């Protein structure tokens, strides 16, 4: 019996410009993914087939720059990073609900040579300068081992996002994994509308630590307007069209995944570790706990 099915279906969202700001269309992308899952699982012979989404992106054309398509501005800053974490988590929940063997998704990004810096193309670096979305993939790459259960009081219900996107309260959610002597937690604050907003105070509790562990080292990485974000540094420099050697080095450094604080020792009390930090809109935090 053949155990491989090639079923081609692009799953994409529809970002727009609303009242002068970018609004993402995550709902459309999720509806397309759900429908694709339903089609595959409607055939008994394919129901248990592993599924990889061959193209899963926020919109359908990587080559649209902000010059003619201002909605592409989301690609330059941390919004694309937050969207990436949000959509992957939502896809995983859809797969769980539909009893689908979801194995991964491909994000299509390209290189666009001889183009202005931060022109809004769907690319991971711009002229060799890493964009925030690449740091989102770096964070996701740190998640390995056994997945842990997560409960978030700030999460928007998955069925609500499927119906209307993230248009009311932001979705403040997390993914956590564990391997030997390490727990890694990715937390994000996502909203479809890229507008200024008050940061969310995150109170994070990790329970079930091994009884013998009394102290841990915590590393806290961050993507926001001021961390792991070369776009902000480029704007601080006056948006140079031809950066000097010194400016280019500064852009390279600002494009790397950065820590919010220096590594810290944290005590374990009663098998728990507690954290409290402000998480801006369209921002991500990665906490790596080792012992």
Residue positions per predicted region:
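Glycan-recognition and catalytic regions of carbohydrate-active enzymes
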Residues: 98-104, 108, 113-114, 120-182, ...
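Conserved, mostly hydrophobic/aromatic
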Residues: 55, 91, 105, 137, ...
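Carbohydrate-binding surface patches
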Residues: 162-214, 220-238, 281-285
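Substrate-binding clefts and catalytic carboxylate motifs of secreted carbohydrate-active enzymes
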Residues: 65-81, 86-109, 210-253, 260
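C-terminal beta-strand-rich structural cap/linker in extracellular carbohydrate-active enzymes
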Residues: 242-291
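Generic recognition of long tandem-repeat/solenoid scaffolds
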Residues: 159, 185-187, 273-277
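Noncatalytic carbohydrate-binding groove/subsite architecture in carbohydrate-active enzymes
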Residues: 1-103, 112, 116, 156-163
């Amino acid at each position: 019996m053949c155990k491989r099915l090639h079923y081609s279906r692009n799953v994409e969202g529809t970002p727009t410009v609303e009242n002068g700001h970018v609004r993402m269309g995550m709902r459309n992308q999720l509806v397309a993914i759900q429908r694709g899952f339903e089609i595959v699982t409607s055939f008994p012979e394919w129901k248990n087939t592993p599924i990889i989404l061959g193209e899963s992106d926020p919109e359908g054309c990587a080559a649209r720059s902000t010059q003619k398509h201002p909605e592409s501005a989301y690609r330059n800053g941390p919004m694309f990073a937050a969207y990436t974490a949000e959509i992957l988590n939502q896809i995983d929940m859809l797969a769980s609900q539909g009893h689908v063997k979801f194995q991964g998704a491909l994000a299509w990004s390209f290189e666009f040579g001889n183009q202005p810096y931060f022109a809004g193309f769907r690319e991971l670096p711009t002229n060799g300068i890493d964009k925030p979305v690449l740091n989102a993939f770096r964070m996701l790459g740190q998640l390995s081992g056994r997945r842990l259960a997560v409960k978030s009081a700030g999460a928007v219900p998955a069925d609500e996002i499927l119906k209307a996107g993230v248009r009311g309260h932001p979705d403040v959610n997390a993914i956590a994994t564990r391997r030997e002597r390490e727990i890694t937690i990715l937390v994000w604050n996502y909203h479809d509308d890229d507008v200024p907003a008050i940061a969310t105070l995150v109170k994070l509790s990790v329970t079930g630590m091994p009884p013998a562990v009394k102290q841990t080292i915590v590393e806290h990485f961050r993507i926001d307007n001021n961390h792991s974000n070369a776009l902000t540094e480029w704007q601080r420099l006056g948006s140079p069209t031809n950066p000097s050697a010194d400016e280019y080095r500064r852009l390279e450094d600002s494009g790397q995944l950065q820590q919010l604080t220096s590594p810290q020792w944290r005590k374990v009390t009663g098998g728990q570790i507690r954290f409290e930090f402000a998480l801006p809109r369209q921002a991500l935090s990665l906490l790596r706990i080792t012992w």
